[in-house]
Each structure stands twice: as C-alpha cells, then as structure tokens.
C-alpha cells in the first residue's frame, strides 16, 4: 500500500503548522508524526481527542509527565506507592503501585504459582 501523507499538527488541523502524518497501513491509529530530526509515535486514538500528557503543538510528552496510561497512572502521573492497583480475590493478596512505574507489579508476597493470577499483571505506557 502506498503511504498517505497528511499535513496537520499533532492533534488538530491548523494552517500555520506543517507537521506530517504518515498513514502506512490505511488505519488512522497506525501513524507517526515526522519531524526533521525526530519521530514521535502518538498513543492509539490520539487523532480522536487531545491527550493531556502530550503538548498539542510539538506532539511530544509534556515536561514532568510520567506516564500515558496504565493501572498505576492517573492524569499523566504515577500513582503514589501503596495505591491498590489489583484487588485481591479469595485468599489472594492485593497488588500495589510502587510509585515508579505505570504497571501494576505483582505482590512479592504472593505464592510463586498463584492460581488467581489471571489475567497477567496489568501494563501501561511510560513516557520517555
């Protein structure tokens, strides 16, 4: 398939800014913003609404933002250490955020082969 080139700004169309979005698969969610010396991959569905973790002009993560999504991410910040991110079921134990990642780490005090460990520990997206 021939890539389609659209001229637009990160999340909205403005005539004064000329960033390029390349749709390689024809799917609006599979795209990259191309700059002279850098490429920013935007979150899935970013074309539909402005993402609060990204600068709408530069399409880059905002300064001092930790994460984009995940069970231990809220408003682009890691949740504080000790916040429950996965409730216990049965005799199981809660999983807690560690304040350093957007993922929900497995409680280290759980048994090695926990029958309640489904689905797998939840993952999120960290901003780099």
Swiss-Prot record:
Keyword Disulfide bond attached: yes
Pfam families: Disintegrin (PF00200)
Disulfide bonds, paired cysteine numbers: 53-59, 67-76, 72-97, 73-102, 85-104
Tissue spec. comment: Expressed by the venom gland.
Motif Cell attachment site per record, residues: 89-91
Keywords tagged on the record: Cell adhesion impairing toxin, Disulfide bond, Hemostasis impairing toxin, Platelet aggregation inhibiting toxin, Secreted, Signal, Toxin
GO CC aspect terms: extracellular region
InterPro entries associated with the record: Disintegrin_CS, Disintegrin_dom, Disintegrin_dom_sf
Position of the signal peptide: 1-20
One GO MF term attached to the UniProt entry: toxin activity
Main location: secreted
UniProt xrefs under SMART domains: DISIN
Propeptide feature ranges: 21-65, 116-128
Annotated ranges, domain Disintegrin: 26-112
Subcellular localization, as worded in the UniProt entry: Secreted
Subunit organization: Monomer.
Family per similarity comment: Belongs to the disintegrin family. Short disintegrin subfamily.
Functional description taken from the UniProt entry: The disintegrin ocellatusin-10c1 is a poor inhibitor of platelet aggregation. The disintegrin inhibits the adhesion of cells expressing the RGD-dependent integrin alpha-5/beta-1 (ITGA5/ITGB1) to immobilized fibronectin. Inhibition on alpha-2b/beta-3 (ITGA2B/ITGB3) is low, and there is no inhibition on alpha-1/beta-1 (ITGA1/ITGB1), alpha-2/beta-1 (ITGA2/ITGB1) and alpha-6/beta-1 (ITGA6/ITGB1).
Protein name, per record: Disintegrin ocellatusin
């Amino acid at each position: 398939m021939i890539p389609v080139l659209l001229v637009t700004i990160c999340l909205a169309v403005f005539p004064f800014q000329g960033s390029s979005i390349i749709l390689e698969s024809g799917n609006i969610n599979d795209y990259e913003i191309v700059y002279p010396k850098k490429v920013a991959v935007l979150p899935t569905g970013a074309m539909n609404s402005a993402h609060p973790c990204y600068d709408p002009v530069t399409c880059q993560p905002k300064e001092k933002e930790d994460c984009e999504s995940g069970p231990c991410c809220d408003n682009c910040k890691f949740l504080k250490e000790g916040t429950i991110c996965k409730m216990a079921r049965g005799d199981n134990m809660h999983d807690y955020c560690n304040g350093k990642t957007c993922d929900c780490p497995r409680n280290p005090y759980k048994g090695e082969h926990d029958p309640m460990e489904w689905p797998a520990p939840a993952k999120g997206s960290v901003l780099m």
